[in-house]
């Protein structure tokens, strides 16, 4: 397949490029012109910017967007996060206005779900907090592409755990925190399984049967971890954990990602036969 990855220079994007490279032709879009010449991709990967002529492709994986954990979540930052994602969708509609690819995968988040003691599948109820509203706007932007006669996957990612970025990188130079009352369940997925799950959707699309022109897919491990268990997974070498009151996570909206409490199940991936590593 010919696959375009937007946001391919990021934490997840680089892992996905490496995973697809041996069996697919990969194109990477980056909106940062300063990054274009510094990407260390193999010569077989074509890097595109907004000024490029976009090649015909079979599928797009949209990972593009400003990182949530970059700085404090002010009102302007939240607007910037949303706009950065919707801008890429708008650009893709312009570039492929006459021949849109048949598969479009939009990176989303499990933060859309309401806290629950029950197991949540892709049909889970939505929360009403600002994260859920943010995710809903992004998903609606992707679903607008249904008018282009393409199939849309909404990939709802849990916290992605990998050594090269995300929560592991943020904790790298800090002692491992241990939160009092940190027994809330956090959906998570390893970076390796994240990339493999995207690859699985691309390669198994023709084998799946659907009753609608889009599919929600939970990207999270099938086992559940509490907040403190997740932090231990992220810093297994840390022998000492520093007790912390949970209220400090409420001081910044980014901390709300670790305050959720829901057991999200990757029902679609499991049903289709995906094997977690």
Q: Where is each model-derived feature located?
A:
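N-terminal Rossmann NAD(P)H-binding glycine-rich loop of SDR-like oxidoreductase domains
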Residues: 3-22
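NAD(P)H-binding glycine-rich loop region in Rossmannoid oxidoreductase-like domains
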Residues: 35, 40-87, 91
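C-terminal amphipathic/interface module of NAD(P)-dependent oxidoreductases
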Residues: 239-240, 256-277
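A conserved pocket-lining segment of Rossmann-fold NAD(P)-dependent short-chain dehydrogenase/reductase
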Residues: 170-193
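Conserved beta-loop-beta element that borders a ligand/cofactor-binding pocket
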Residues: 140-163
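Mid/C-terminal beta-alpha module of Rossmann-like enzyme folds, strongest
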Residues: 2, 204-252
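Conserved Rossmann-fold NAD(P)-dependent oxidoreductase catalytic core, especially the SDR/UDP-sugar
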Residues: 89-129
């Amino acid at each position: 397949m010919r696959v375009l990855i937007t946001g391919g220079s990021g934490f997840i994007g680089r892992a996905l490029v490496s995973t697809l490279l041996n069996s697919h032709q990969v194109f990477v879009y980056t909106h940062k012109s300063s990054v274009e010449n510094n990407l260390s991709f193999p010569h077989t990967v074509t890097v595109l910017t907004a000024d490029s002529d976009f090649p015909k492709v079979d599928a797009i994986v949209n990972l593009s967007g400003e990182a949530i954990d970059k700085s404090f979540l002010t009102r302007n930052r939240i607007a910037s996060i949303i706009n950065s994602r919707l801008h890429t969708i708008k650009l893709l509609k312009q570039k492929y206005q006459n021949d849109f690819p048949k598969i479009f995968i939009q990176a989303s988040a499990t933060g859309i779900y309401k806290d629950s003691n029950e197991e949540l599948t892709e049909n889970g109820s939505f929360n009403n907090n600002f994260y859920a509203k943010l995710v809903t706007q992004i998903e609606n932007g992707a679903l607008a592409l249904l008018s282009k006669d393409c199939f849309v996957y909404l990939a709802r990612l849990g916290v992605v755990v990998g050594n090269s970025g995300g929560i592991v990188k943020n904790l790298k130079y800090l002692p491992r925190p241990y939160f009092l009352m940190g027994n809330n369940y956090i959906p998570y997925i390893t970076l390796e399984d994240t990339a493999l799950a995207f690859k699985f959707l691309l390669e198994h699309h023709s084998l799946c049967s659907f009753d609608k022109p889009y599919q929600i897919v939970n990207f999270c491990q099938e086992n559940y971890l509490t907040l403190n268990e997740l932090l231990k997974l992220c810093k297994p070498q840390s022998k000492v954990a520093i007790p912390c009151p949970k209220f400090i996570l409420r001081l910044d909206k980014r901390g709300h990602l670790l305050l959720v409490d829901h057991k999200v199940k990757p029902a679609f991936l499991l049903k289709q036969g995906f094997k977690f590593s």
